Amino acid sequence: PYIDLNTYGVMNCTHAAIDGMCERGHGRIVTISSGAGTVGIPLGITAYGAGKGGGIAFMRHLAMEVAATGVTANTIAIGMIDNHTDPSVTAHMAKTVPVGRLGQPHDIAALVVYLASDEASWMTGQTLELNGGSVTT
């Protein structure tokens, strides 16, 4: 199921929109993935990480195929996000993040807005790690 959702899901959704973007000569594709798709994590999530990695690889290749059409394709690989679980769990998890807190939805939204803007027209094929410094590249 992880490959179906996290790889083929990205591919199918992107294919539904890409032709129109290429015909118009402008478009921004931004996918949300996970740091588990870029680095190994010893938490028993191998299949999940492989699925996320497949979606990331797809976006990198797609970016090269459509770059000359004015369409960009980038991925945001997020780290731990505060999903309002048990406060003691959240506090423990936050201690493992170098900036000292978990991500918030607005952290992701700000980067999506930038990547979808004309200011990001020269950025394509990138996987941006958004994780409070937990993984650096």
Where are the regions a protein language model picked out?
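Active-site helix of classical SDR
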Residues: 14, 51, 59
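Residue(s) in the substrate-gating loop at a strand-loop-helix junction
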Residues: 34
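Active-site Tyr-X3-Lys motif and surrounding loop/helix of classical short-chain dehydrogenase/reductase
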Residues: 1-4, 92
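Short C-terminal tail/terminal secondary-structure segment
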Residues: 39, 113, 124-137
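Short, small/polar-rich loop/turn modules that mediate ligand/substrate recognition or access, typified
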Residues: 67, 72, 123-125
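Active-site loop-to-helix junction immediately N-terminal to the catalytic Tyr of the SDR YXXXK motif
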Residues: 40-49, 61
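Alpha-helical segment proximal to the catalytic Tyr-Lys
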Residues: 19, 64-65, 121
